[in-house]
UniProtKB/Swiss-Prot annotation:
Acidic residues composition-biased segments: 420-433
Species whose genome carries this gene: Dictyostelium discoideum (Social amoeba)
UniProt-listed SUPFAM superfamilies: ABC transporter transmembrane region, P-loop containing nucleoside triphosphate hydrolases
CDD domains: ABC_6TM_ABCC_D1, ABC_6TM_ABCC_D2, ABCC_MRP_domain1, ABCC_MRP_domain2
Signal peptide bounds: none
Chain segments carrying region Disordered: 409-478
Listed name of the protein: ABC transporter C family member 1
GO molecular function, one term: ABC-type transporter activity
Length: 1359
């Protein structure tokens, strides 16, 4: 029955509200144009075009994206970007606040209608006090002079005066909101475009965390200012002048007393505003640092867990958070003082005005309540003008942060010349006559930036010429400067294979970076083709399907795609994936092995069909068999007719090169293999010495033949020719999935959809919030104090009514003034108390929520990070925490302040006119229905808007990580288009969220105006003129609060979504057992060292005790271990059994994806065993605390993890070792000379990711950590894959010496690094297929290892 009634109401409402508009529950509105575009004038004025969404959201359940229409074209980012087309942010622009000034100019030029509405609103603000003045005159007139029809006319006049003012306000806010969205859109996309242009040097000051703060916080503050506050200083000033003139007309010059007080308080408010802005700026700076560290923490979470360094990073983040909170607290204190000033000034102005007026005049009803009405109207500009000044002062540092980012160094423009430009160039000579890639007299420097490339404006030519002259002068002065690459000449013949080789840190990556424009070109000339494919040493992958990562924005060519899959040897890997090539790849390829990631990058380059391929170590992470296949079928196969530049340490391929470039300490020697040998350059000696003496090449003629690992040209070529296609037994069609298969697509998903709660925010969320904010009783007391303060304030008006009528005989004005002052003082006292109580609650909640969130995420399982993109997680720490920090205090204060004001006002009106409760009940019913209609839709729109932010941040994170790849493929426009779509989606939800609010505001304001009419109407029948006027005045004052209460209640619920989203992360799955030793202080550790045994501080261990002398041997045993990633899918290790004796050095080999790295993940419990167990020294590691386990093991990971901080901090984060011990470790890994040559040595700062260090140097730095740690069990996961053979040979000696008393597991594709191992374990498809000594395995001609060795240049024979 109720359901039928609901449907009937729905049908009636749909018909009445939508009129002739078509309403279809099943229609997809996502692609439909904005209904405002085709709405008639009435619908535009009343926002009736937004009704469909309101009805759909209320009757059809939660709104979905299919219910949301498209944006108007002028609001889309593609249009709004024009706002910043002509801005000049050049470094030589000395204008102050260029961004703010530019937006003001654009606003004045583009928003004349908004300016007109602001003027109209100011004029209409005078109408209500005037109407009240004439109504009071009518009420005070004798019964003979009063006409009932005239009274009705005055009531209608009050209704019109009230509604016209608020109605014009709604239209004003709507058009201002459109401008705000345009500004937000153009700034957001400009920040993203700038991100894609950042140089390596420019990027050092910014990382995804700080840029995300710019997008989520700074841009939002700027756009909000230009929505509400941008006209405040001018509009509220003019409104105050108009109302002040009216006040002087009513009470004479006494009105100037109040004005004088306001003028006096302006400097105080300005000073407080400046303090608020200053503290906000400081807090934002620490917020950036905190977000940067959090971003770094999330990106490196796997490494941090393996190193057991979570505590280190959590402490660093908390340190920045504490500093941020320090300034947020100061800001809050100043904010409270500002609010106290505003509220107190309102009251004091009224008191002093009446005191001065009463000296020579008698306070009458007309004077008293017309003055009150004027001051009620003045209350908005009185409150908002200081707030606008304060907001402008706060905006200046925020805008400066955005300006500084937009001015940061960009990638160098005109870095290289293409072939068409070469023909007309003055340097055109035989260097590039055949279309070769070349560098002519080139000098490059990582630390220098392009001064002309920074900024986004169109600076004038004179400024640019001056900059160029200054740059030339600097270059002349720095001729003696040592560049990264100085005055080099390089040539890669067109259509040929050029191989670049050299020792670690010699400048190989810098050389190719010079070709693609990633390093600043100081001088010289670079010639490159138009289309280049570049693969980085650390692969860049998007969080999308494997297929999309290969296509990378190009159209699908099925035949070429199949050939690419075959050439890159991906077919066997794809067969093992759930959805084949449609399998979703996690962020940074977390569900792939290193070799698989490199081959996908190589496939992307190959599919692009470019003119030139630059490949930086694409063969280092694959086994010899796959490396040979890639070289034969990809580099020398499908790429054969293209120019190829290959950086590699794989010596077996060097004789096959058409051109070879040897790089040593920034110097180049180049030629064919035979030419270099004739010059005395022999690759045997290159790999046997740390540094080449290029100037004495002719003297290097003798080589140590016993260590010769290079094949002759003929042998090498034969080896490659004899290699068979290792994927020729696989039907390529089997690995290409049907993208229309919904079941397959579902299985391919790795990332989980973001949680979205439906309906109102659960009461539990509020309870949890207040529990984090001290206590629930404290909040209840705060609510009571708010109510008491507003009752006292309203009683002052009640007393004024008594005063104006002299209701108490024989009392002088002094008596009335004293009581009135008592009310005002009481109000101010309770005002201070309520604000400080609310500040304590919200500040404590903010502090504790972040602490709980950080702890929860820090201890989360790895699966959580695998299935949630980092941008989504970081969104909790940036936008959601920012909302909790900056908005909830204001919102709770507003709701309690406005809500208590409305309740007290209604109580007064019912007390004065009891009969008014009858129409009130009807209006309350209508009011409640409209409010629910609005709340259901607005809340879901806000939730969708919050969810739509995560894809923006995820794309930003991925783009920043892949800047070099995106730029080398010239895919900036594609990524900008992707970001535009995501911003438009986010703004679409904001736009319709604003529209439904304007819809409800117009209707609630009309109801408020009816309340004014009813209060005036019932006052016609009241014999007490004072009470009658008080009722009408109270109704007029309540109008502005009623709609604001509803708006702020919904806004509060929306922002509580941030709390809800944070709390959803407080209960995420944690890793196995708790981490003992984690929160113990040094004294506890010393006490425990004196004991023979210690207990785990966790109930899960059931009294299990771990011997203090655990892990003294290093024996490892895998017993029938089975490990799988996630709850579904194939196991990565299957019935895996392996026993390793103490001090054994075990080499682990197998093709990529065989399960080698899973052994390490299982050992460190990065993933738990689904079956079986792993024992170390006889103890099942599943019973050992994770921190205890991981801190006892050593690891050198495949992808080196370098975090921001000093070199010392990266090597010894807990400050356990002396300088001499650190230097010894660095000397052992051959980094001592490199580090000691740096000006600050161990205190040299390194940026996140180790910018400034080569890939090999990063690996060596990680190795130095493990050497210092001196663990009994060490895992080496491709630890030397990025290191040349000579350094690798020296490091191998170091490893053998340093870890001779350790049990070591070495995962490697370069067999020379494991040939001396005690035993070799061969893994295939998650199973142990061979396990024996290297001698025994090689002597067995049928063994897999023996065949691998043959593919690796017969290394064993040379032993």
């Amino acid at each position: 029955m109720l359901k039928n009634l609901r449907n009937k109401i729905k049908e009636k409402l749909t018909y009445s509200l939508l009129s002739s508009q078509e309403f279809d529950n099943n229609k997809d509105y996502y692609q439909q144009p904005c209904p405002e575009d085709n709405a008639n004038l009435w619908s535009r004025l009343t926002f009736g075009w937004a009704q469909r969404m309101l009805i759909s959201g209320y009757f059809n359940g939660p709104l979905e994206m299919s219910d949301i229409n498209d944006l108007p074209k002028d609001i889309k980012v593609q249009s709004s970007i024009q706002l910043l087309n002509n801005i000049n942010l050049n470094k030589n622009n000395n204008s102050r606040w260029p961004l703010i000034k530019h937006f003001y100019k654009q606003f004045l030029y583009r928003n004349k209608l908004t300016i007109f509405l602001q003027i109209l609103t100011n004029i209409l603000s005078i109408l209500s006090p005037l109407s009240l003045k004439y109504f009071i005159q009518f009420i005070q007139s004798t019964n003979k002079e009063r006409s009932f029809l005239a009274g009705i006319g005055y009531c209608i006049l009050l209704l019109i005066a009230s509604f016209s003012y608020t109605f014009s306000q709604q239209l004003l806010m709507w058009f201002a909101m459109k401008s705000s969205l345009e500004i937000k859109g153009c700034l957001s996309i400009k920040v993203y475009e700038k991100t894609l242009k950042l140089t390596t040097c420019g990027g050092k000051n910014y990382n995804p965390g700080s840029i995300m703060n710019l997008l989520s916080v700074d841009v939002g503050i700027i756009s909000n200012f230009f929505w509400i506050e941008h006209m405040g200083i001018f509009a509220f000033s003019s409104q105050m002048i108009g109302l002040l003139a009216l006040l002087c007309w009513v009470i004479g010059w006494s009105g100037l007393v109040g004005f004088a007080i306001m003028v006096i308080t302006f400097p105080i408010n300005t000073y407080i505003g400046s303090k608020i802005g200053k503290n906000l700026k400081e807090s934002m700076g620490y917020s950036d640092k905190r977000t940067n560290l959090t971003s770094e923490f999330i990106n490196g979470i796997r490494f941090l867990k393996m190193y057991a360094w979570e505590k280190l990073f959590l402490d660093r983040i908390e340190e920045q958070r504490s500093l941020q909170l320090k300034y947020l607290y100061k800001r809050m204190i100043f904010w409270i003082f500002a609010e106290m000033m505003k509220q107190a000034v309102n009251a004091i102005v009224l008191v002093l005005t009446f005191i001065v007026y009463s000296i020579n005049n008698e306070i009458t009803l007309e004077v008293a309540f017309t003055t009150i009405s004027i001051f009620v109207s003045l209350r908005i500009p009185l409150l908002r003008l200081p707030n606008s000044i304060q907001q402008l002062q706060s905006l200046i540092p925020i805008a400066k942060r955005v300006e500084d980012f937009l001015k940061s160094p960009e990638i160098q423009q005109n870095h290289s010349s293409n072939r068409e430009e070469e023909e007309e160039d003055e340097y055109d000579d035989d260097i590039n006559s055949d279309g070769d890639i070349s560098i002519h007299n080139g000098s490059f420097n990582w630390n220098q930036v392009d001064s002309n490339g920074s900024g986004n404006g169109n600076g004038n030519q004179q400024q640019q010429q001056q900059q160029q002259q200054q740059q030339q002068q600097q270059q002349q002065q720095q001729q003696q400067q040592s560049y990264t690459l100085n005055n080099i000449n390089f040539k890669a013949p067109a259509g040929k294979l050029t191989i670049i080789c050299g020792v670690v840190g010699s400048g190989k990556t810098s050389l190719v970076s010079g070709l693609i424009g990633e390093i600043y070109k100081v001088s010289g000339r670079v010639n490159t083709p138009n289309k280049i494919s570049f693969t980085t040493q650390q692969s860049f992958l998007l969080s999308t399907s494997l297929r999309e990562n290969i296509l990378f924005g190009n159209e699908m060519n099925l035949e070429r795609y199949k050939k690419v899959i075959e050439a890159c040897c991906l077919a066997p890997d794809l067969l093992q994936l759930a959805a084949k090539d449609l399998t979703e790849i996690g962020e940074r390829g977390i569900n792939l092995s290193g070799g698989q990631k490199q081959r996908i990058s190589l496939a992307r380059a190959l599919y692009a069909n470019s003119d030139c391929y630059i490949l930086d170590e694409p063969l280092s992470a694959v086994d010899p068999e796959v490396a040979t296949h890639l070289f034969n079928h990809c580099i020398q196969g499908m790429m054969n007719d293209k120019t190829r530049i290959l950086i590699t340490h794989q010596l077996q391929f060097i004789p096959s090169a058409d051109h070879i470039v040897v790089v040593d300490n920034g110097k180049l020697v180049q030629g064919t293999y035979s030419e270099l040998k004739s010059k005395g350059i022999d690759f045997e000696s290159i790999m046997k010495t740390k540094k080449l003496n290029i100037d004495n090449q002719q003297q290097q003629q003798q080589h140590e033949k016993e260590n010769d690992i290079v094949l002759s040209d003929e042998d090498s070529n034969n080896s490659i020719k004899n290699n068979n296609n290792i994927s020729n037994l696989i039907d390529i069609d089997e690995v290409i999935s049907d993208e229309n298969d919904s079941n397959l697509i579902e299985r391919s998903k790795l990332l989980v959809d973001e949680d979205r709660n439906e309906g109102s925010v659960n009461l539990r969320v509020y309870k949890e919030y207040f529990k984090h904010g001290s206590s629930i009783p404290l909040f209840i007391m705060t609510c009571i104090v708010y109510m008491i303060s507003q009752i006292i304030y309203q009683m002052s008006d009640f007393w004024l009514s008594t005063w104006s009528q002299r209701s108490i005989p024989d009392k002088t004005d002094k008596y009335y003034i004293s009581i009135y002052l008592l009310f005002i003082v009481g109000f101010i006292i309770f005002l201070v108390i309520r604000y400080f109580m609310m500040a304590h609650v919200t500040f404590s909640a903010s502090k504790n929520l972040h602490q709980s969130l950080l702890k929860s995420v820090g201890f989360a399982s790895c699966q959580f990070f695998d299935t949630n993109p980092s941008g989504r997680i970081l969104n909790r720490f940036s936008k959601d925490i920012s909302d909790v920090d900056l908005l909830l205090f204001d919102l709770f204060s507003d709701v309690l302040y406005c809500g208590s004001t409305v309740l007290v006002s209604i109580g007064i009106m019912i007390y004065i006119s009891p009969l008014i409760i009858i129409p009130f009940l009807l209006l309350i019913g209508i009011y409640y229905f409209i409010q629910r209609l609005y709340t259901e839709s607005s809340r879901e729109l806000k939730r969708l808007e919050a969810i739509s932010r995560s894809p923006i941040f995820s794309l930003l994170q991925e783009s920043f990580n892949g800047l070099v790849t995106i730029r080398s493929y010239k895919q900036q426009n594609k990524f900008i288009s992707m970001m535009q779509d995501r911003i438009n989606t986010n703004h679409r939800l904001s736009y319709y969220g604003f529209s439904v609010h304007r819809w409800v505001a117009v209707r609630l304001e009309f109801i408020s105006s009816i309340v004014v009419f009813l209060a005036a109407f019932f006052s016609l029948f009241n014999s007490n003129a004072g009470f009658s006027v008080l009722s009408v005045t109270t109704a007029l004052g309540m109008c502005s609060y009623l709609n604001w209460t509803v708006r702020q209640m919904v806004e509060l619920e929306v922002k509580m979504n941030s709390v809800e989203r944070i709390e959803s992360y407080l209960n995420i799955p944690k890793e196995g057992n708790s981490k003992i030793n984690f929160f113990r202080n040094e004294q506890q550790e010393e006490e425990e060292e004196e004991e023979e045994e210690f207990d785990f501080d966790n109930d899960d261990y059931d009294g299990f005790k771990l011997s203090k002398k655990w892990l003294t041997k290093g024996e490892i045993e895998f017993r029938n271990v089975e490990i799988k990633y996630g709850h579904s899918g194939e196991s990565s290790l299957k019935n895996f059994t392996l026993k390793i004796n103490q001090k054994d050095h075990i080499g682990i080999v197998g093709r990529t994806g065989a399960g080698k790295s899973t052994i390490g993940n299982g050992l460190f419990r990065m993933v738990e065993c689904s079956k079986g167990s792993i024992l170390i020294d006889g103890v099942d590691i599943s019973k050992i605390g994770l921190h205890e386990l991981r801190s006892s093991l050593g690891i050198v990971p495949q992808d080196p993890f370098i975090f921001s901080g000093t070199i010392r901090l990266n090597i010894d984060p807990f400050n356990k070792y002396t300088d001499s011990e650190i230097w010894v470790a660095l000397e052992k890994v051959k980094l001592k000379s490199t580090i000691s040559s740096m000006p600050l040595k161990l205190e040299t700062m390194i940026e996140e990711g180790g910018d400034g260090l080569s890939f090999g140097q990063k690996q060596l730095l990680c190795l130095s950590r493990t050497i210092l740690k001196n663990s009994k069990v060490v895992l080496m996961d491709e630890a030397t894959s990025g290191i040349d053979y000579v350094t690798s040979d020296l490091i191998k000696q170091t490893i053998n010496n340093c870890f001779k008393n350790c049990t070591m597991l070495t995962i490697a594709h370069r067999l020379d690094t494991i040939i001396d191992s005690t035993k070799i374990a061969v893994i295939d498809k998650g199973k142990l297929i061979e396990y024996d000594t290297p001698n025994n395995l090689i002597e067995n001609q049928e063994s897999r290892f023996s065949k691998l060795v043959k593919h690796h240049h017969n290394l064993f024979k040379e032993k």
